[in-house]
From Swiss-Prot:
Taxonomic classification: Bacteria, Pseudomonadati, Pseudomonadota, Alphaproteobacteria, Hyphomicrobiales
Protein source organism: Rhodopseudomonas palustris (strain BisB5)
Top enzyme class: lyase
Pfam families: PEP_mutase (PF13714)
Descriptive protein name: Oxaloacetate decarboxylase
Cleavable signal peptide: none
Cofactor note: Binds 1 Mg(2+) ion per subunit.
Annotated function: Catalyzes the decarboxylation of oxaloacetate into pyruvate. Seems to play a role in maintaining cellular concentrations of bicarbonate and pyruvate.
E.C. designation(s): 4.1.1.112
Family annotation (HAMAP family): OadC
Residues annotated for Mg(2+) binding in this entry: D85
Record SUPFAM superfamilies: Phosphoenolpyruvate/pyruvate domain (SSF51621)
Positions of substrate binding: S47, R156, H232
Self-association state and partner proteins as the record states: Homotetramer; dimer of dimers.
């Protein structure tokens, strides 16, 4: 039931009239902070998953098991609904079925399946797409695999940047006809491109990291853009903070000399320390301080 409530919250965003900018989340701490700050939605991107879990770039090295386990940790840590970037579904259409089942069980509110050819093909320096037919097969497999009908399935295409706008629209129309809940486009750069996409489709739209020309949120909302992913600055900020702290310590600074550290109050809030103390009093007979 808890998962269904989160999925209902994501569906409410998609059926609403506003353009939401989700928080980029990647672990228990980041999702709790996002939830506490009042974000309505979290986005668990493939690139941040690879960085947070493996310390690797976004080149499809992460496994489905690793992705699902991290999603499970986040779902346990906070009630914020999360849209998961499930990349290519970790294989063919049959692998996509397994991907949907694992992420559904892990507590994802929704997931995206894309048509990028992953991992990168031998001898190909630039990104490639799978065929429209193979992409459609993956989408149909994803829809068939979900046990909870409230789980959101988003069809994603990178055709705008790789092949053409017409190809992107053709693929999106096919995914829409198959029954996806929303359409995710990457590589959209201009208003005329977005206008054409909105005119050719009827489903809610998700945009990946829109450029400056596409940051008028009222305009985006009018074009049925319900989610605009705004990159993954939090993990970049965290990486920089860790690098600076360790660099200072290596150079001889005392821990108390460091600046920019989380306060004790923030740590207590993020770790839910007062709730743990309350449970200790309730179940272990411990006195609260």
């Amino acid at each position: 039931m808890a998962w269904r409530n989160r999925r209902g919250a994501l569906r409410a965003i998609l059926s609403g009239s506003a353009c939401v900018r989700p928080a980029s989340v990647y672990d228990a701490i980041s999702i709790r902070i996002a939830d506490d700050l009042g974000f309505p939605l979290g986005m668990f991107g493939g690139s941040v998953a690879s960085l947070a879990i493996l310390g690797d770039p976004d080149i499809a090295l992460i496994t489905l098991t690793e992705l699902a386990e991290q999603m499970r940790r986040m779902a346990r840590a906070a009630a914020l609904p999360v849209l998961v970037d499930a990349d290519h579904g970790y294989g063919n259409a049959l692998n996509v079925r397994r991907t949907v089942q694992e992420l559904e069980a892990a507590g994802a509110a929704g997931l995206t399946i894309e048509d990028t050819l992953l991992p990168q093909a031998y001898g190909e320096a630039s990104p490639q797409l799978i065929s429209r037919e193979e992409g459609l097969g993956k989408i149909k497999a994803a829809l068939d695999a979900r046990l909870d009908p409230s789980l959101v399935i988003v069809g994603r295409t990178g055709a705008c940047a790789i092949t053409s706008l017409d190809d992107a629209i053709d693929r999106a129309v096919a995914y829409q006809a198959a029954g996806v809940d929303a359409l995710f486009f990457t590589g959209v750069k201009t208003r005329p491109q977005l206008d054409a996409i909105a005119a050719a489709t009827t489903l809610p739209i998700v945009l990946g990291s829109p450029p400056a020309e596409l940051t008028d949120w009222d305009y985006l909302a009018a074009q049925r853009v319900r989610i605009a992913v705004q990159g993954h600055a939090p993990i970049a900020a965290a990486t920089e903070a860790v690098s600076k702290a360790l660099s200072a310590l290596r150079d001889g600074a005392a821990p108390k000399q460091l600046t920019g550290l989380a306060s004790a109050e923030l740590i207590d809030r993020v770790t839910r320390a007062s709730l743990v103390e309350e449970r200790g009093a309730q179940f272990l007979g411990l006195k609260r301080e």
